[in-house]
Amino acid sequence: MAKLIIPSDYDPKMTIRETEKAIRYIRETFQTEFGTAMNLERISAPMFVKKSSGLNDNLSGWEKPVSFTLHDGNEGELQIVHSLAKWKRWALKHYGFSHGEGLFTNMNAIRKDEEVLDNLHSVYVDQWDWEKVIDKSERTEATLRQTVQRIFETIKGMEYHVRALYPQAAYHLPEEISFVTSEELEARWPSLTPSEREDKICQEKGAVFLEHIGGALPLSKKPHDLRAPDYDDWTLNGDLLFWYEPLQRAFEVSSMGIRVDEDRLQEQLKLAGAEDRLDLPFHQALLKGDLPYSIGGGIGQSRLCMLLLGKAHIGEVQASIWPDEIVEKCQAAKIQLL
């Protein structure tokens, strides 16, 4: 399904070549400042993993990854990654990262089953996937919120950099971020859909970290949004959202969380009806205590560029494939798809 929001009287303010230069600047500058602020080291990341490893991100549970086999077939089915959520935790262990240290990667993924292709969603996903070692005693809301605050401040700092170089295009971000839970949103707006609740709270607050994604809510008995049961702890995770004036909607830049421990892994797999995953190598390692406790997430590279440059469509900051109807409408509205 394809949906498109056309801002009235849209003016891109930058040529395609100017946009490309700005994209490069944002990507290079942000990853340096983000890595420094979070004590993260950049490492290489796989484009595909073995299906049998259990390392791929199952997302909501129904999306099928792009898969293939090698010529001799000896390695079994290989899958293009959806994200590196579980692989990163494995890498923390095998690359020798210690408490307080972490990694980030330049992650590229294909999500062929993306339900809606719109201003924010593409089948091509590029993000800074990151993971950091913590102690079990740090598996707390305080740790989560401190980390969110640090990421928000790094993004806010990027706004000042972009405004200095591209004052005609830079989008103004709020000065502060608010914290709210999905349960609080449901209680306040029970008749609205989860996405409508996000729009409401973001328009009110400007920037929000929405906590508790994945578990069933008290009133609806349904989760605010689906989340894989074997990486985030659903009680210690969330999405970083901004109110985005050009599209008049909430704008997600990052999803992150404190990762499951041995107990939460088993609890969430049972709730999801996915206990068969416990036999996979990744899950066995976690149950045996062979993997570190960690916090991690992903920050959308194209999303961040789009936000900071005030673009109307993610296709203005990444090269992807779009339905002909969207391409034609974008051309008519001066939206310059790459």
From Swiss-Prot:
Its main location: cytoplasm. One of its GO terms (cellular component) is cytosol. The keyword Cell cycle does not apply. Its EC number is 6.3.1.1. It is found in: Cytoplasm. GO terms for biological process: L-asparagine biosynthetic process. It comes from the Bacteria. Keywords: Amino-acid biosynthesis, Asparagine biosynthesis, ATP-binding, Cytoplasm, Ligase, Nucleotide-binding. Belongs to the class-II aminoacyl-tRNA synthetase family. AsnA subfamily. This is Aspartate--ammonia ligase. The lineage of its organism: Bacteria, Bacillati, Bacillota, Bacilli, Lactobacillales.
